[in-house]
Design a protein with these regions (language model features):
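Short secondary-structure junctions
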Residues: 36-41, 149, 190-197, 239-240
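Short loop->beta-strand "edge-of-pocket" segments that line small-molecule binding or catalytic clefts
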Residues: 157-180, 184-198
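N-terminal subdomain of lithium-sensitive/metallo-dependent phosphomonoesterases centered on the IMPase/IPPase/PAP
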Residues: 1-98, 297-301
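DPxDG-like acidic metal-binding loop motif
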Residues: 86-150
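Residue-level detector of anion-binding/catalytic polar loops
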Residues: 70-72, 193, 213, 238
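Oxyanion/phosphate-interacting regions
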Residues: 1-19, 185-188, 202-303
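Residue-level signal for inorganic ion chemistry
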Residues: 28, 53, 64, 101, ...
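Short helix-loop capping/hinge motifs at secondary-structure junctions, enriched
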Residues: 148-151, 155-158, 292-296
Length: 303
């Protein structure tokens, strides 16, 4: 079957993203539980960055520049040069070289390399490397908008495990869940068996695979969820973002959940979006099986 020009572009982007995720995985496996150079991005020593974070991001960025020189790049470990107040490219690669750096440093094999591609702010492609049991090279879960989601070469389709939309299986929640959110009494009794992993991208992959029925994150950055959002949507799942709006004649803001379809801030047109805007993106999200996500959202508010 002949592909049109747009399909050819996304096929090339997808192949490169999957290749880079696998290459990142090789670097991660080669350096796991090995001596690392660790620095901290904050004065409190809570936000580490390793030489492997920097190495992987540099490798990914250079490869993208070589294949798609006109594409934009936004990485977690970027310097201030990336955050300049300038319009971004229509195609923007959003990368977290190691999501779960604390786990990686500690020797806990729960981490991910997340590579997302946005088109005019819309999540169009995602590839996430995952360390995987009984695998010498790990696995990559990936998706392209309109083409479905895959775990390595196997197509995945998210199924509802609860006909009532109430979770009875595993869910992943942030440690600050009860401090940030106010669940209803109904939700408290039906929230499921919760876990905390320390990697948002990893949790989104688990939700796309149906291992976790849904996940909640209170303030992810764009590089944490750009890839996972596309993957969950293409697997048949749902991703909601929490927004606060001040309505006319109201003193207090109203919090509500809505579909996450674009990362463009405040629904602005793409032409007005800058790399600096996107770097500052942070909103709470719920993601996973649609019925459970909707049930959770209808019973969950911010404090």
């Amino acid at each position: 079957m002949m592909l049109d020009q747009n399909e050819k572009i996304w096929e090339s982007i997808s192949k490169l993203a999957i290749k880079l995720a696998n290459e990142a995985g090789f670097i991660l496996y080669e350096n796991f539980r090995k001596p690392l150079s660790v620095e901290f991005k904050d004065k409190s020593g809570l936000d580490p960055v390793t030489n492997i974070d920097i190495q992987i991001q540099k490798h990914i960025r250079n490869s993208i520049k070589s294949h798609f020189p006109e594409h934009g790049f936004l990485g977690e470990e970027e310097t201030s040069a990336t955050s300049q107040n300038k319009n971004t490219s229509e195609y923007l690669w959003v990368v977290d070289p190691i999501d779960g750096t604390k786990n990686f440093v500690a020797g806990l094999p729960i981490y991910a390399c997340s590579i997302g591609v946005l088109y005019k702010g819309i999540p169009y492609m995602g590839a996430i490397f995952l360390p995987w049991p009984n695998s010498t090279k790990g696995s990559v879960i990936h998706a392209t908008k309109g083409s479905g989601a895959y775990f390595n070469d196997e197509k995945i389709l998210l199924c509802e495990n609860s006909q009532e939309g109430k979770s009875s299986g595993l869910v992943t929640l942030p440690g600050s869940f009860t401090n940030i959110f106010n669940p209803s009494e109904i939700l408290k009794n039906k929230i499921g068996d919760y876990r905390m992993t320390g990697s948002i991208a990893y949790e989104m992959a688990m939700s796309a695979l149906g291992i976790s029925q849904f996940m909640v994150s209170n303030a992810p950055s764009i590089w944490d969820i750009a890839a996972g959002t596309c993957i969950i949507l293409e697997s048949g799942g749902l991703v909601l973002e929490g927004v606060s709006e001040r309505k006319r004649f109201r003193i207090f803001e109203e919090f509500k959940w809505k579909n996450l379809n674009s990362f463009n801030p405040n629904n602005e047109s793409f032409e007005k979006v800058t790399a600096s805007n996107l770097r500052k993106w942070q909103k709470p999200i719920i993601a996973g099986a649609p019925k459970i996500v909707n049930f959770t959202a209808s019973n969950l508010r911010k404090r």
